[in-house]
Amino acid sequence: MARNVTDFHGILLFRRDYAERDFLIKFFTQEFGKKMFLVRGAKKRGFKMVADILPFTVGSYVGDIADDGLSYIRTARETRQFQDISADIFKNAYATYIMSLVDTAFPDSQPLPDWYHRVQRALTLIDDGVNAAIVTNIMEIQLMPAFGVAPQLQGCAVCGRNDLPFDYSESYGGLLCQAHWTLDPRRLHVSQRTIYYLRQFSVLDLDRLHTIKVKPQTEHALRQLMDEIYDSQIGVHPKSKRFLDQMQSWSARLKPPTDH
């Protein structure tokens, strides 16, 4: 098995206990894609890299990188933790879900520098207070092709027109213009505002996003649409998504009643 001692940049996707004193840590690296690292002695008192391998950490490291199998971290150069994500249970849930999707969407050891940058940018936006639900929607939409689902979102899937109202059709693999709605009696009846955001988010450069305001009803509609597509067409159900759904349910119950 070939190994290479080198610098790398990484986003910590998750960590798990391994044996009595060790951790298995999965990083999404800029240079090598997703890699699993064995960190020996990580649970021992006085371990020097404790702060560098906390959840929601990004930074530069030196590692013994294996082509296949486990790699090893030798030292950390410069790291930082997404503090607000770590401290806020809702931001934490959205960030964990995004990283779960990325981990599921791509094979290990496949360099994906563009996606590394997108994930880092998405986490930065959430950490900075940009609407975590909307950042998550953007990532869900842009990840769909990686799961083998690439809906037609820029024009009608039948005729290509983009000057009429749209609806979403799972049967036709994307948008149907109003002239072809009768072709699919089971189209999703999505609002035009929701369709607008769906189309915009599919091509949005996260580097150009600094703030966004979406009405609560539209945010809810986007969540429903993403759930429908991921449930029926993609079939991916990370544990982190179930926890996120529970969180949203708790939040709805905890909202104070409105006065009439």
UniProtKB/Swiss-Prot annotation:
CC terms in the record's Gene Ontology section: bacterial nucleoid
InterPro entries assigned: ARFGAP/RecO (IPR037278), DNA_rep/recomb_RecO_N (IPR022572), NA-bd_OB-fold (IPR012340), RecO (IPR003717), RecO_C (IPR042242)
Keywords: DNA damage, DNA recombination, DNA repair
NADP keyword on record: no
GO aspect biological process, one term: double-strand break repair
Entry superkingdom: Bacteria
Pfam families tied to this protein: RecO_C, RecO_N
The family this protein is said to belong to: Belongs to the RecO family.
HAMAP family given in the database record: RecO (MF_00201)
Role according to the record: Involved in DNA repair and RecF pathway recombination.
Name the record gives this protein: DNA repair protein RecO
Species, as recorded: Levilactobacillus brevis (strain ATCC 367 / BCRC 12310 / CIP 105137 / JCM 1170 / LMG 11437 / NCIMB 947 / NCTC 947)
Gene (UniProt): recO
